[in-house]
Amino acid sequence: HASARGEGFLLLKADCNKGYVTVKQIGVNPTSVDLVDVGKDEEVKMRPGQVLHIVNKLYPFVVQFGEESEESVMEAEEKIQTEKRPCEDSCENDDIENVPKKAKKMEVVDTQSSSADLRPSKSSVSPHEGTTSRKEHLGHWSQGLKSSMQDPKVQVYKDEKTVVIKDKYPKARYHWLVLPWDSISSLKSVTREHLGLLEHMHAVGQKMIQQCPAKESLEFRLGYHAIPSMSQLHLHVISQDFDSPALKTKKHWNSFTTEYFLNSEEVIEMVRSKGKVTVNDQASELLKLPLRCHLCKQQLSTIPQLKEHLKKHWTK
């Protein structure tokens, strides 16, 4: 933003990997982040969830990080383009490292003109107060797994090697993510030296199943997505009922019910024998397969039809 004389000029620099925008006030007109003045020639870091006011608190903005990709695994286009769900599919949407064919996108959202569903921070004053929504997602989840795993509010188990969090958008009644504390971007980075860690992650996943109150009536699978849509290695522990409103697309379904979902034990054996994990280059094509029931293999035309069909298996 800049006035004719440069009085309200700001310099914004986005660091997409770290999930913040550096705000530097060049002009003299007051600029604030969460109502704290930046100061002329000073700079602060603004993260998703904070509100930037330009020129005497007249123009509030928030920042949103998303991703764009022709082959985005988990509906990245849907996340960016829809107002209602900016952070779909396990909120696997940011902090992406070394993932090919993906570009980061930073949006500065004018909270007055385009986002009537944004909730302001507690310290800000806005006519939209009381509405739910996007802003809540822009807190820690929009910054990716690396920040989420550090948040005690979402941790359900932790030890010296791993932490378990509930999937923000669970695709079944029970859906956890087991993550290592060590920074490991994906299965591509795994070597034989990580074998013990993978075995430990699997054991932690089994522990989550054992403490589940529905363990006697539900089947579970432990595994990894062939092409993860966010960085930081994570093991899915998911019940096989797939009874969840967050399961909305064919890609969601196929990512857990085709060979796109790599069984944890098979990954461990691959690392043990080959020293690395190899993934089929055409794995993304699996997401386009027709919808089939994972239990009886009946083909269904739509997600609503599939969900109705699944209910037949629950009662057996």
Curated annotation (Swiss-Prot):
Entry annotation: catalytic residues: H234 (tele-amp-histidine intermediate)
Region (Interaction with DNA substrate): 167-171, 229-230
Start and end residues of each HIT domain: 142-247
Biological process according to GO: single strand break repair
Protein name: Aprataxin
Free-text function comment from the UniProt entry: DNA-binding protein involved in single-strand DNA break repair, double-strand DNA break repair and base excision repair. Resolves abortive DNA ligation intermediates formed either at base excision sites, or when DNA ligases attempt to repair non-ligatable breaks induced by reactive oxygen species. Catalyzes the release of adenylate groups covalently linked to 5'-phosphate termini, resulting in the production of 5'-phosphate termini that can be efficiently rejoined.
Domain observations: The histidine triad, also called HIT motif, forms part of the binding loop for the alpha-phosphate of purine mononucleotide. The HIT domain is required for enzymatic activity.
SUPFAM superfamilies referenced in this protein's UniProt entry, alphabetically: HIT-like (SSF54197), SMAD/FHA domain (SSF49879)
Record Pfam families: DcpS_C, FHA_2, zf-C2HE
GO CC annotations, alphabetized: nucleolus; nucleoplasm; nucleus
Record-level Gene Ontology MF annotations: DNA 5'-adenosine monophosphate hydrolase activity; DNA-3'-diphospho-5'-guanosine diphosphatase; double-stranded RNA binding; mismatched DNA binding; single-strand break-containing DNA binding; single-stranded DNA binding; zinc ion binding
PROSITE patterns with a match to the protein in the record: HIT_1 (PS00892), HIT_2 (PS51084), ZINC_FINGER_C2H2_1 (PS00028)
Region described as Disordered: 104-142
Residue numbers marked as site, Interaction with DNA substrate: S148, H225, H236, K251
Magnesium listed as a keyword: no
Start-end of Polar residues biased regions: 110-130
The protein's enzyme class: hydrolase
Keywords for this protein: DNA damage, DNA repair, DNA-binding, Hydrolase, Metal-binding, Nucleus, Zinc, Zinc-finger
Residues in FHA-like domain copies: 1-38
Zinc finger annotations (C2H2-type) as residue ranges: 291-313
Coiled-coil region list: none
Record lineage: Eukaryota, Metazoa, Chordata, Craniata, Vertebrata
Motif annotated as Histidine triad motif, chain positions: 232-236
Gene that encodes the chain: APTX
Record EC number: 3.6.1.71, 3.6.1.72
